[in-house]
Amino acid sequence: MAFPKRLEYGGHALVWSGDWSAAGARKAIAGAARAGYDYIEIALLDPWQIDVALTKDLLQEYNLRAHASLGLSAATDVTSTDPAIVAKGDELLRKATDVLYALGGSELCGVIYCALGKYPGPASRENRANSVAAMQRLADYAADKGINIDLEVVNRYETNIMNTGLEGLAFLDEVNRPNAFLHLDTYHMNIEENGMAKSVLAAGDRLGYVHIGESHRGYLGTGNVDFASFFAALKQIDYRGPITFESFSSEIVDPKLSNTLCVWRNLWHDSDDLAGKALEFIKQRY
């Protein structure tokens, strides 16, 4: 079954902190709460390093919820034809699900269906079949814990499995699990889609998670993303799910993620100013 979603506004942890040490976790959670967000999206690239008890205490202290995202690596790529690598990917995804469950979260999103990064060629039938099978296993595992999985559609330089929302929906048809949803990100859509509405309208209630990011990943409204069309489409389908503000700058670096995403430029310095203005921007439109 699919698990309940609500319209809620969150911020990606990397807006405030590049690590999840005790100090980093407090900085991120306090920052998200200070800006007025409902939840924080925690990057579970290495879920074994998360201090669950500490994080739960901080979430309670700041009255914040948590969801989680991650991207796989070459060592954990579930599209691989090497069963040992697929097994490592399964293990990582299960551990991330366990951590999210312990934190009381209900949405696991991101590039959880392949390695996050540029592939040397298109996916083979076997690569795709392996990915579909892995998502079926993950969805079933997550369902036992009341968790939805949201598969993020990203640009051609970060996956060869799905680059548009329509491709994502076709992939979800193969996964065929009620708790598996589409995750759209305006930054990636701006690169790959023919307009910002088509995939949203096609997805309808299968759209389960949204990332709001500008074309350069900085301040919202200062790039070339057509947010008016995107939010109009969300209204047309009456979207009721998480909306996360996501932004990256060399000001705050996570070595496991920033280099993979090619975050070379310093697009902002003040996390609080960035996050506060982003939430205002989003709520004015949705």
UniProtKB/Swiss-Prot annotation:
Q: Does this entry carry the keyword Aminoacyl-tRNA synthetase? A: no
**Sample GO molecular function, one term:** isomerase activity
The residues that the entry says bind D-allulose are 12, 69, 152, 158, 188, 211, 217, 246
The temperature dependence reads: Optimum temperature is 70 degrees Celsius with D-allulose as substrate.
InterPro entries for this protein: IolE/XylAMocC-like (IPR050312), Xyl_isomerase-like_sf (IPR036237), Xyl_isomerase-like_TIM-brl (IPR013022)
What positions does UniProt annotate as the active site of this protein?
152 (proton donor/acceptor), 246 (proton donor/acceptor)
Q: Which UniProt keywords apply?
A: Carbohydrate metabolism, Isomerase, Manganese, Metal-binding
**Mutating residue 9 to I: effect?**
Affects thermal stability. Slight increase of the activity with D-allulose as substrate
Enzyme nomenclature, EC number: 5.1.3.31
Q: Which residues bind Mn(2+)?
A: 152, 185, 211, 246
Domain of life, per UniProt, equals Bacteria
Q: Provide the residue positions that the database annotates as binding D-fructose.
A: 12, 69, 152, 158, 188, 211, 217, 246
Per the record, what are the reactions this protein catalyses?
L-ribulose = L-xylulose; D-ribulose = D-xylulose; D-allulose = keto-D-fructose; keto-L-tagatose = keto-L-sorbose
Q: Which SUPFAM superfamilies match?
A: Xylose isomerase-like
Cofactor(s) for this protein?
A: Mn(2+)
Q: What's the record's remark on domains?
A: Contains a unique short C-terminal alpha-helix compared to the known structures of the structurally similar homotetrameric L-ribulose 3-epimerases and D-allulose 3-epimerases. The length of the C-terminal alpha-helix was thought to be involved in tetramerization and increasing stability, however, the addition of residues to MetLRE at the C terminus does not lead to tetramer formation.
Query: To which protein family does this belong?
Result: Belongs to the hyi family.
PANTHER family, per this entry?
A: HYDROXYPYRUVATE ISOMERASE (PTHR12110), INOSOSE DEHYDRATASE (PTHR12110:SF41)
Q: How does it assemble?
A: Homodimer.
Q: What does this protein do?
A: Catalyzes the epimerization of various ketoses at the C(3) position. Exhibits the highest enzymatic activity toward L-ribulose, followed by D-ribulose, D-allulose and D-fructose. Shows lower activity with L-xylulose, L-tagatose, D-xylulose, D-tagatose, L-sorbose, D-sorbose, and weak activity with L-allulose and L-fructose.
Protein's recorded name: L-ribulose 3-epimerase
Q: What species does this protein belong to? A: Methylomonas sp. (strain DH-1)
